[in-house]
Swiss-Prot record, chain B:
Its main location: cytoplasm. Belongs to the flagellar radial spoke RSP9 family. GO terms for cellular component: 9+2 motile cilium; axoneme; kinocilium; radial spoke head; sperm flagellum. Functions as part of axonemal radial spoke complexes that play an important part in the motility of sperm and cilia. Essential for both the radial spoke head assembly and the central pair microtubule stability in ependymal motile cilia. Required for motility of olfactory and neural cilia and for the structural integrity of ciliary axonemes in both 9+0 and 9+2 motile cilia. The keyword Cytoplasm applies. This is Radial spoke head protein 9 homolog. InterPro entries: RSP9. GO terms for biological process: axoneme assembly; cilium movement involved in cell motility; motile cilium assembly. The gene is RSPH9.
Amino acid sequence: MGDPPPDPEPPSQPTSSSRNSQVSERRRSRERTRPLVPEELQQIPLDPQRNLRGWPQRASLTPNENLVFQAEDPYVNPGFSAEVQPQAYLSEGRLQASHNASLMLPQLQQGEGNLFQQLESAYQGPPADLPGQFTMYQREDLPFSQGTQHGPYMRDDPTLQFSPSELGFMSFNMELPEPEPRELAVQNAKAYLLQTSVNSDLSLYEHLANMLTKILNQRPEDPLFLLESLNRTTQWEWFHPKLDTLRDDPEMQPTYEMAERQKALFGRSGSGEGEQEMEEETAETAVPNIMEKAFYFEQAGVGLSSDESFRVFMALKQLVEQQPIHTCRFWGKILGLSRSYLVAEVEFREGEEEAEEEEVEEMTEGGEGMEAHGEEEGDEDEDKATDVIPKPTWKPPPVIPKEDSRTGTNRYLYFVCNEPGRPWMRLPHVTPIQIVQARKIRKFFTGYLDAPVISYPPFPGNEANYLRAQIARISAATHISPLGFYQFGEEEGDEEEEGGAGRDSYEENPDFEGIPVLELVDSMANWVHHTQHILPQGRCTWVNPLQKTEEEEELGEEEEKADEGVEEVEQEVGPPLLTPLSEDAEIMHMAPWTARLSCTLSPQYSVAVVRSNLWPGAYAYASGKKFENIYIGWGHKYSPENFNPSLPAPIQHEYPSGPDTIEMSDPTVEEEQALKAAQEQALAAAEEEEEDEEEDEDEDQDD
Amino acid sequence: MDAESLLLALELASGSGQGLSPDRRASLLTSLMLVKRDYRFDRVLFWGRILGLVADYYIAQGVSEDQLAPRKTLYSLNCMEWSLLPPATKEMETQTSVVKGRFMGDPSHEYEHTELQKVNEGEKVFEEEVVVQIKEETRLVSVIDQIDKAVAVIPRGALFKTPFGPINVNRTFEGLSLSEAKKLSSYFHFREPVELKNKTLLEKAELDPSLDFMDSLEHDIPKGSWSVQMERGNALVVLRSLLWPGLTFYHAPRTKNYGYIYVGTGEKNLDLPFML
């Protein structure tokens, strides 16, 4: 700070002086107002040691003590007048500082206003008033009862004679002495330190003062070591005062809400039935043992962390309680842009889901019916108009009916939630057209089920439908199990069913013994798909789109005409259920599956892990009699080539130009005039003829 | 992620689904310690895992005193023995840009790429098909370098710059606040700044030269190539890159925990503009 090193002084002096400066204003005002002070001040130099002991008290900044301590400094040693001046300037600085200004304002007002005005003016023009300051602080050494000082003016006060300072000569000296260069340097340094920074009202000086106060308050073990962190904390605290304990931190609000919600997950439903509940719960529940599966997947290096898995488990338990669920499985997690989806694959108990399905269907059908009516009316109006609009010959392609619940792609119902603790939402069944379109587009999920999917070709549905379609594709492609775990039911002896669709149901094999892990890893033939392959049509079982159901026959009389142009549609066939993985097609000379042992260091205890290369993120493990599939990823297929969006449809043909469709061009002015002239001529000619005829008649009559 | 806080880091980054199995974790903890000693690194970061068809590569990076100096990259197939990779050069990048598809998992595997090269034989100039062999190791180096340059992330305030040159770790970094954590502008690319000089003077005036000396993620092209999410009930912010799917950056707001890991196939998502 540029203070001259005070030698005989104890080392705490410089700091103490800085402390002093902080409230020097206050003190000075009190000095003015308390004539008693001078006597006290006189006594203090007798005990310089008190300075040290008094330090902790000083920190508490009680006015009286401060006053004492501050006032004592000028008296410690007359030789330290240089010390005094820095304090003076410090005090000026205090005026500028907003921090103490508020504290001091009342005191300022109470105190001698004049003095402070003078100080202010002095600070603003240091060079000019330096001498004034000099003299003033010399005078400060004196005990004075009356306040008003105006710089270099003489004060006519008999008490001025008291002080042992060297002010004696000043009293009579009206000249303004040159400030020593050292003092000037000190003042400059201090003025520099008191600059407030651009971003805030804090000046380095104040900051250092705060920090040193803090250190002295807390007296940590190794202050040098902690200096940096203290620096930051002090600064931070200055700008972030601790909030009330009564008020919550606004930023943390959503976090606390989420925590509350998750807390609700952990609460047991129903209260205090004690043992009865325990017995019920230990019986078979639909909730799978997520923790066990998470453990196995962890061996493979896949999956969510264990506490997250546990939360998923609790969330599934909540789902099972809310919905009539027969079996349930954690399908996986699909990552999205703003939020992710946790997907649960469930099967309802028999007959339970029909009610909801019908409601949904009625709503859609009702909507369609109304639309059809609207169109018909519109058509009628148009028919009544004078021009007959040619009917388009384009017919929309026949809608392939979606598969029934519990069959094919709609075998399971899916529920999604964004985070454990949030409510589960049900995904609608998937329609074949949605699957077909989903194959053509590639979009990230945003995390909101009602977000629109903007793509070309336009996806028929919103994100919920797209999500469901991707889930269907992933399930069909990557749900695998060890060979022999599932087998076909013995009742279905025939392989040939309607249209050769193949078997679509399987059951667990009670005699399954498990395949050794090494064999599972070696050969892909030991794994089979246990979900049906989705045909290009979008369904698992093929449906001839041109076959008319009864509803179509009722509504579409006009469509009979289209029968003439019917093309033969070939039946689509896909690999049957329970096909081994070795039959899967390669992706550009790359095997579609990668199998590994989970841990090469301990093969006897590892699990076999199979990873899909076609759908990155799909994993399956098998160990002994247990196996499981999971998908954690973005929900897109892997393609070695870049994505090529579909080209827009070719431009439709226009109608051939003919007299019906071409707009007549309006006649130009010249043509009109020419026509008019021609008409007038014709009229004139007609009149002449008439006149001639009349003349002839007249002549005839005359005759 | 820092090797010292590996376990916690793996736990926090597990939201993306891929992590490490316990045996790998254990081997990493030991071997990274030895790597730090042998190579005299200031910090060792576990960079991630590149999935290959036959085997996976585990990558670690060593950081010296100056945090922004080029980092040394090491790879291992079993998390125990680490081999140093050569630094990446421009030629490597051009050479490997023609290789597509997955990594094999065998560092000595060579990709064959046929090129048409003009060969001068005397006066005749004709094109000959030349088969260029590109080693997988080169490809590995180049991919890691690209990923680092494109999507390695560090939060604002974690590093600070001294006027004397070296970039140091900020020991008083207490984490971003919740509101800051959700903004992309609070995260920087962990590489030498490229776009900083293009900022207008007005923007630069608001920057703190000791903290804002790297490019922020805000102006990444294409816009929206980062997905910012809160996980674990709003107690963790996770940034996932959509350009290099598999890169996950996590940070627990108001704490010092942050880090990034890449677990993926090592292929850039060139379809990104279609997917947003």
